[in-house]
Regions:
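Short helix-to-loop capping/linker segments positioned immediately adjacent to catalytic or ligand/cofactor-binding
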Residues: 48-52, 60, 72-73
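Glycine-rich phosphate/diphosphate-binding loops that line cofactor/substrate pockets in enzymes
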Residues: 55-68
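Glycine-rich phosphate-binding loops that contact phosphosugars or nucleotide phosphates
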Residues: 65-175
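Amphipathic, non-membrane alpha-helical segments in soluble helical-bundle scaffolds
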Residues: 31-35, 127, 176
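HTH-adjacent hinge/linker in prokaryotic transcriptional regulators
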Residues: 1-55
Length: 176
């Protein structure tokens, strides 16, 4: 126990304070960029571990496992990681979609039913497509897994599972 406590204290002491919005600038050396990105990843993982509720994660995993199809709804800079997750689902034999256009997302929502599971990724909960898509999914009894900040969860209560992420990043003043 003592060894583990010392290890954890040492790791915490080695974490560097990094500006999450601007971890580096034009004057940063490659070594500084690497060091700051390491600090950023460590901070992100630690915060995610603190915020993520294991019961919600388990619920989300079970919903995905039993779903006939998983549809991912997101936009902007979240499209690439969402597409990567879709590809992993497809590789595992799970039918999945992730469309970039709002029109395709709306049509997918309209074609969904309780056999689908929707994963909605919006850290702020303010993504423009949500105003149209969430009521459709709700009316069609589609279980919705929300990936977002605590604010997003408060803004959109009543869904099947919430995977909460940090809200330290500025929505308007950052490197994207």
């Amino acid at each position: 126990l003592k060894v583990e406590l010392i290890r954890l204290a040492t790791e915490a002491g080695n974490r560097r304070d990094v500006d999450i919005n601007f971890p580096f600038d034009a004057t940063s050396t490659p070594a500084q960029v690497m060091e700051r990105m390491e600090g950023l990843y460590q901070t992100t993982l630690a915060e995610t571990q603190e915020l993520l509720d294991p019961a919600q994660l388990d619920r989300a995993a079970k919903l995905i496992a039993k779903a006939r199809q998983v549809d991912i709804y997101t936009g902007s800079h979240n499209l690439y990681p969402a597409g990567m997750f879709r590809d992993r689902l497809l590789s595992s034999g799970k039918s999945a979609t992730c469309y970039s256009s709002t029109e395709a997302q709306v049509r997918t929502a309209l074609a969904s039913d309780s056999g689908n599971v929707a994963i909605v990724i919006s850290y702020s909960g303010l993504a423009p497509n949500l105003k149209e898509i969430l009521p459709i999914l709700s009316s069609r009894h589609v279980p919705v897994i929300v990936i977002g900040t605590p604010y997003c969860a408060r803004l959109h209560p009543g869904f099947a599972a919430y995977l909460t992420v940090s809200d330290h990043e500025s929505m308007t003043h950052r490197i994207t």
